[in-house]
């Protein structure tokens, strides 16, 4: 699955400049608000809320911000109503792009996403045009620094926990699961004492497009423009 690009994207999110970090926290607060409003404020009984709280903590979002978003959802009878929409399209040279949004105005969001594609060498496509190239997976990364365990031993532990696939590098163990097994695997690894660098449900390309440096820069520019939109929660591509 060549997950290292997934890790790179997560690190990019974590290391965002202060101005961008504020926008990331705002988007995460929106996700927390929606999850708490739809499934209740208790993460113990609300799996969606548990997942987004983990995602927020991975992004170093302060606990006060997380609690505030949950309380806002709990005390709101009306409030804004957000709809989740995923747009699909093609970036420069036809690379596959999926854009997950939470919006209270579909027309505004569609126009904004379409403009981002068209001004950055891409085009917005029809529903289903690229989603078949991705699989929804659980993703867990564990940094190997100071971890005294060999790959074979760790692989046996991961398989025992219910994981689907393990990828290794000098710095990382990257674990993939079916979405239904994600929480079970995550809990098992935590109970064994592993510190998870990140854990989330994501979209993973079945194969990655090989691109040169110039095309990589164009794709990253498109991603930056899309991520700058307040309605855009996640951008997935099949580029390393």
From Swiss-Prot:
Location within or outside the cell: Cytoplasm
Pfam families: TACO1_YebC_N, Transcrip_reg
GO CC, any one term: cytosol
Biased composition (Basic residues): 1-14
Keyword set includes Transcription: yes
Residue segments, region Disordered: 1-21
Any one GO BP annotation for this protein: regulation of DNA-templated transcription
Gene3D superfamilies hit by this protein: 1.10.10.200, 3.30.70.980
Keyword annotations: Cytoplasm, DNA-binding, Transcription, Transcription regulation
Predominant localisation class: cytoplasm
MF (Gene Ontology): DNA binding
InterPro entries noted in UniProt: Integrase-like_N, TACO1_YebC-like_2nd/3rd_dom, TACO1_YebC_N, Transcrip_reg_TACO1-like, Transcrip_reg_TACO1-like_dom3, YebC-like
Family, similarity comment: Belongs to the TACO1 family.
Protein name: Probable transcriptional regulatory protein BLi02909/BL01150
Lineage of producing organism: Bacteria, Bacillati, Bacillota, Bacilli, Bacillales
